[in-house]
Amino acid sequence: MNNLTGILYIVATPIGNLQDITQRALAIFEQVDLIAAEDTRHSGLLLSHYGIKKPFFALHDHNEQQKAHLLVEKLQQGQHIALISDAGTPLISDPGFHLVRQCRQAGIKVVPIPGACAAVTALCASGIASDRFCFEGFLPAKSKARCDKLQNLAEEERTLIFYESTHRILDTLADIEKTLGAERYVVLAREITKTWETIVGDNVANLRQWLGEDPNRTKGEMVLIIEGKVKQETDEINPQALKALELISQSLPLKKAAAIVAEIYGYKKNALYQYGLEHFN
């Protein structure tokens, strides 16, 4: 790596409460020569709050692939650059991937400056398992594509995290109910760190009803945390054992049939018995 090249700093900014900026982020803003931002007007207002004035470079979804090389050239000339998004951590459902990849390929040092991230902030307050999770960004805008995406994730056991917009939230919850079931537990985190912060959890059917009762509840930036599929013991029982259970239970009491099949196939008889209660007449 050329020591004369500049450094690209990936700097997280607040997601609502301006007090959540870090001292390190402010120090980096003072040091860099240029700030790359999604919306330069929005970011200019943000940084002016902290008394920081720096030149901006607009880098957003519509121009990143064409413009990233210009920033790489500036870095190679020795300029230091901070990359920020409109809110939160850059690259998390925000631009920056192409720039960071090009920098790493060019041997330019990339330094992350951690801070707020809406997905992780919502997850830690959701009460849903956080040891394994899957962040999927925004779901598709069209219902058909959205349902297809959700169907592909229907068997996912990890916690699912999505961002969603205010004008699609009710339709999205309806599609979640249709594809994942009315009883799937969902937490909605709205306006995190802001005045009207709301974090509410319920099964998706109840949550959709609650949101629909007051238009104000569907306003603001939203994160959806969906509990992963809870595997039932019967999910692991092979079809041959279940077929045997069905046949034997036609001539013997279900409890006896479950005991016989459990002995033959090595499954728990209680799991087999429960399956029979739920599926056999």
From Swiss-Prot:
It catalyses: cytidine(1402) in 16S rRNA + S-adenosyl-L-methionine = 2'-O-methylcytidine(1402) in 16S rRNA + S-adenosyl-L-homocysteine + H(+). It is found in: Cytoplasm. Its EC number is 2.1.1.198. GO terms for cellular component: cytoplasm. Keywords: Cytoplasm, Methyltransferase, rRNA processing, S-adenosyl-L-methionine, Transferase. Gene3D superfamilies: Cobalt-precorrin-4 Transmethylase, Domain 1, Methyltransferase, Cobalt-precorrin-4 Transmethylase, Domain 2. GO terms for molecular function: rRNA (cytosine-2'-O-)-methyltransferase activity. HAMAP family: 16SrRNA_methyltr_I. Catalyzes the 2'-O-methylation of the ribose of cytidine 1402 (C1402) in 16S rRNA. Belongs to the methyltransferase superfamily. RsmI family. This is Ribosomal RNA small subunit methyltransferase I. It comes from Pasteurella multocida (strain Pm70).
